[in-house]
């Protein structure tokens, strides 16, 4: 208590300033809040040699004599010599590592101000747009500052963030106004960045490669300019030590940790040098050390002039001290907006002062999270050494109403409205698009990136090639030495059927890699870094070398081990036919994966489809003998196995002659009629190849429709929703 007493000039007891509900708080607890206007004392990290004792630079908005708004450097204070002041109620903040530390020079502001007034967001419920997720929210954010939207789960944090960024889903409707630099103009491409809670990274690329390809996809201009932007993003997010490290690692090296991956996701948006950066849960799944490092890095980014707005569930005391302003939400209602220290005073005035040894964010969530009521009910007979289990002895719903009413009648709410009026009374600089890379450039970048990823993904590509070789060797040894007699026709037909069917079925092993590509596309498309056509064309061109390598290696082994006709032109047709078969199969897998977006359901569906196509391919029963409904129409005609096998058999038997006895002979077409139905036309095999080519493009056209118009959202969304319901019921 001696240390607390020594800080009496900066702190006062909440019992002397709180409103009447303070009586509900046990007297055995001591609560202290900072006096308004007192300076923030940063913590020193004496045990960390990487952080120097630098002054804490606080960027805040002040009114000048001329009535304008300006960003001024606040008074800097020396670093506290110890961590003990954290326990005395001081909102501690670690020093921000900057290039010009200690010089007191404020960097040029390149951000943009954003303000929102009476912002309400509704979602489609039982009645159209009946569920209000965000209710009449007001707030603002300045360049060079960090504004955090805090609240419990399902409080409307992410919805408010998406509304500010203009990224609400079609099922949501927004009311109210959002101003950027004083005007209601839409933020163009490249003027802002948005980082999702969970982003998909490419594990087989290094950090520098990943950011460089992202810059090539996003930015126009010359290569050397993009390299400079990438290096700036790496420096800004403190990724220099990991720049040449694979994101996902490999057999002999671990990949990046969750905190480092999160910083890479943010760095990807920084290559556009946005004025405003929106981040959904930057501390998601991060431990305390990674969380603190993340926030210090973001603080450094804010000091460069960028406007940061992000959501957060809870934070430690050190992290909380880094925030400039806080928007506290509960059930869509704004319980407070203002500076972080003023939020502590607000809770104290409402009768819920923060205990000395408790993190402010934990205290806020305890007071406004209704889930704690169930825990208190379960533990109502439990008491700690000081008496009560909880410091807030009030029903959460009552606490929320008290905090909301206190805020609406406070000077903080009036100051927010006054600042919004001041920010919107005149229009500032309009944000302009910085341009984007052309479609041809994006296709070339995605193609080259796909080739690089395939060359490094041994688990999904090279292992798949090995499996194809093992399968082909197995089939080749099983059907070796057949000869060219009439008696070997049935066995040769079976060998071709087994080769095409089983090789296509084995291609399902590539589903995980395709799902990763779809997730990467969705992540890039959400920020307009890529498009459906560009993605499909780049993926198609990038997969051609790998699929052709598999087709030529497997075809050569099978062709010579089984002993098919010794003719180079026939061999080339065999290779091309099987290559087209793999292209169709890849398109089918991409189509199914795009529908489900789940490994289990995609694999199950593909296996079922392949089995049906194999049954209708004409080997187990000739196509003319198949039942007309279902099996002939449509299965026999939509099965790509049918056209591939038919073309390969026409390639093998048309023009061939078999001797029957010593004087009689029959054509290859006549010899195969009892085993498989083919056409006697010598050009029929090329028609079958054209059908395969059309199917390869047809499946990708269906994928384009799904990606472009989002027709798969309802199917996959319902599946995931039912899956979550089943898990919750368990």
Swiss-Prot record:
<feature type="binding site">
    <location>
        <begin position="151"/>
        <end position="158"/>
    </location>
    <ligand>
        <name>ATP</name>
    </ligand>
</feature>
<dbReference type="GO" id="GO:0016887">
    <property type="term" value="F:ATP hydrolysis activity"/>
</dbReference>
<feature type="domain" description="ABC transporter">
    <location>
        <begin position="114"/>
        <end position="356"/>
    </location>
</feature>
<keyword id="KW-0472">Membrane</keyword>
<feature type="domain" description="ABC transmembrane type-2">
    <location>
        <begin position="441"/>
        <end position="653"/>
    </location>
</feature>
<feature type="compositionally biased region" description="Acidic residues">
    <location>
        <begin position="47"/>
        <end position="56"/>
    </location>
</feature>
<feature type="region of interest" description="Disordered">
    <location>
        <begin position="1"/>
        <end position="100"/>
    </location>
</feature>
<dbReference type="InterPro" id="IPR003593">
    <property type="entry name" value="AAA+_ATPase"/>
</dbReference>
<comment type="similarity">
    <text>Belongs to the ABC transporter superfamily. ABCG family. Eye pigment precursor importer (TC 3.A.1.204) subfamily.</text>
</comment>
<feature type="transmembrane region" description="Helical">
    <location>
        <begin position="689"/>
        <end position="709"/>
    </location>
</feature>
<feature type="transmembrane region" description="Helical">
    <location>
        <begin position="600"/>
        <end position="620"/>
    </location>
</feature>
<dbReference type="InterPro" id="IPR052215">
    <property type="entry name" value="Plant_ABCG"/>
</dbReference>
<dbReference type="GO" id="GO:0140359">
    <property type="term" value="F:ABC-type transporter activity"/>
</dbReference>
<feature type="compositionally biased region" description="Polar residues">
    <location>
        <begin position="72"/>
        <end position="91"/>
    </location>
</feature>
<feature type="transmembrane region" description="Helical">
    <location>
        <begin position="575"/>
        <end position="595"/>
    </location>
</feature>
<dbReference type="InterPro" id="IPR003439">
    <property type="entry name" value="ABC_transporter-like_ATP-bd"/>
</dbReference>
<protein>
    <recommendedName>
        <fullName>ABC transporter G family member 3</fullName>
    </recommendedName>
</protein>
<feature type="modified residue" description="Phosphoserine">
    <location>
        <position position="93"/>
    </location>
</feature>
<feature type="transmembrane region" description="Helical">
    <location>
        <begin position="532"/>
        <end position="552"/>
    </location>
</feature>
<feature type="transmembrane region" description="Helical">
    <location>
        <begin position="465"/>
        <end position="485"/>
    </location>
</feature>
<dbReference type="InterPro" id="IPR027417">
    <property type="entry name" value="P-loop_NTPase"/>
</dbReference>
<dbReference type="Pfam" id="PF00005">
    <property type="entry name" value="ABC_tran"/>
</dbReference>
<keyword id="KW-1133">Transmembrane helix</keyword>
<feature type="transmembrane region" description="Helical">
    <location>
        <begin position="495"/>
        <end position="515"/>
    </location>
</feature>
<keyword id="KW-0597">Phosphoprotein</keyword>
<feature type="compositionally biased region" description="Low complexity">
    <location>
        <begin position="1"/>
        <end position="28"/>
    </location>
</feature>
<keyword id="KW-0813">Transport</keyword>
<keyword id="KW-0067">ATP-binding</keyword>
<dbReference type="GO" id="GO:0005886">
    <property type="term" value="C:plasma membrane"/>
</dbReference>
<dbReference type="Pfam" id="PF01061">
    <property type="entry name" value="ABC2_membrane"/>
</dbReference>
<dbReference type="GO" id="GO:0005524">
    <property type="term" value="F:ATP binding"/>
</dbReference>
<dbReference type="InterPro" id="IPR013525">
    <property type="entry name" value="ABC2_TM"/>
</dbReference>
<keyword id="KW-0812">Transmembrane</keyword>
<keyword id="KW-0547">Nucleotide-binding</keyword>
């Amino acid at each position: 208590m001696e240390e607390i007493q020594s800080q009496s000039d900066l702190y006062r007891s909440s019992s002397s300033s709180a409103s009447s509900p303070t009586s509900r708080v046990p007297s055995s607890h001591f609560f202290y809040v900072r006096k308004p206007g007192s300076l923030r004392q940063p913590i020193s990290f004496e045990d960390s040699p990487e952080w120097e004792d630098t002054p804490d630079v606080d960027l805040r908005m002040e009114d000048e004599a001329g009535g304008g708004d300006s960003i001024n450097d606040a008074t800097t204070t020396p670093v506290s010599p110890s961590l003990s002041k954290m326990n005395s109620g001081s909102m501690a903040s670690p020093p921000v590592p900057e290039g010009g530390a200690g010089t007191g020079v404020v960097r040029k502001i390149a951000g943009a101000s954003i303000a929102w007034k009476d912002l309400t967001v509704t979602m489609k419920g039982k009645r159209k747009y009946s569920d209000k997720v965000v209710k009449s929210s007001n707030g603002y954010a300045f360049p060079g500052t960090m504004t955090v939207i805090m609240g419990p789960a399902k409080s409307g944090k992410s919805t408010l963030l998406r509304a500010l960024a203009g990224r609400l889903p079609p099922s949501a409707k927004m009311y109210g106004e959002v101003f950027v630099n004083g005007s209601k103009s839409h933020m163009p491409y490249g003027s802002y960045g948005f980082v999702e809670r969970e982003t998909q990274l490419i594990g087989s690329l290094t950090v520098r490669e990943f950011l460089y390809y992202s810059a090539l996809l996003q930015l126009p201009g010359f290569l050397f300019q993009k390299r400079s932007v990438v290096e700036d993003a790496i420096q800004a997010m403190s990724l220099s030590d990991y720049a040449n490290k694979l994101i996902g690692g490999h057999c002999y090296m671990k990949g990046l940790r969750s905190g480092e991956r999160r910083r890479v996701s943010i760095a990807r948006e920084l290559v556009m040098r946005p004025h405003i950066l929106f981040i959904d849960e930057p501390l998601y799944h991060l431990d305390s050390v990674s969380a603190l490092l993340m926030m210090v890095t973001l603080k450094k980014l804010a000091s460069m002039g960028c406007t940061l707005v992000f959501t957060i569930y809870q934070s430690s005391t050190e992290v909380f001290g880094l925030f400039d302003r806080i928007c506290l939400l509960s059930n869509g209602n704004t319980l407070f907006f203002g500076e972080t220290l003023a939020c502590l005073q607000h809770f104290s005035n409402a009768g819920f002062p923060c205990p000395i040894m408790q993190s402010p964010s934990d205290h806020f969530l305890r007071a406004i999270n209704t889930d704690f009521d169930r825990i208190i009910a379960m533990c109502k007979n439990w008491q700690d050494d000081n008496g009560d289990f909880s410091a807030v002895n009030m029903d959460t719903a009552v606490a929320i109403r008290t905090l909301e009413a206190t805020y609406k009648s406070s000077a903080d709410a009036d100051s927010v409205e006054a600042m919004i009026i001041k920010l919107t009374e005149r229009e500032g600089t309009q944000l302009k698009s910085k341009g984007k890379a052309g479609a041809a450039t994006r296709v070339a970048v995605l193609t080259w990136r796909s080739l690089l990823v395939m060359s490094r993904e041994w688990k999904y590509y090279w292992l798949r090639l090995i499996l194809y070789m093992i399968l082909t060797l197995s089939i080749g040894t099983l059907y070796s030495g057949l000869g060219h007699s009439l008696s070997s026709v049935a066995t040769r037909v079976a060998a071709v059927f087994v080769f095409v069917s089983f090789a296509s079925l084995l291609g399902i092993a590539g589903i995980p890699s395709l799902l990763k590509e779809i997730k990467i596309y969705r992540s890039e498309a959400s920020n307009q870094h890529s498009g459906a056509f560009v993605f499909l064309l780049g993926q198609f061109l990038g997969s051609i070398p790998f699929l052709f390598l598999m087709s030529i290696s497997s075809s050569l082994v099978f062709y010579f081990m089984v002993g098919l006709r010794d003719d180079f032109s026939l061999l080339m047709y065999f290779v091309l036919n099987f290559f087209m078969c793999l292209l169709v199969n890849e398109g089918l897998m991409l189509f199914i994966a795009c529908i489900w977006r789940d490994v289990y359901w995609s694999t199950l569906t593909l296996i079922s489809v392949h089995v049906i196509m194999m049954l209708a391919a004409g080997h187990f029963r000739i196509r003319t003998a198949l039942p007309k409904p279902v099996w002939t129409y449509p299965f026999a005609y939509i099965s790509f196995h049918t056209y591939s096998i038919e073309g390969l058999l026409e390639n093998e038997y048309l023009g061939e002659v078999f001797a029957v006895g010593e004087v009689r002979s029959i054509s290859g077409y006549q010899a195969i009629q009892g085993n498989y139905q083919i056409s006697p036309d010598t050009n029929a095999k090329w028609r079958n190849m054209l059908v395969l080519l059309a199917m390869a493009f047809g499946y990708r056209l269906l994928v384009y429709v799904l990606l472009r118009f989002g027709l798969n959202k309802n199917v996959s969304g319902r599946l995931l929703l039912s899956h979550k319901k089943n898990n919750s019921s368990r």
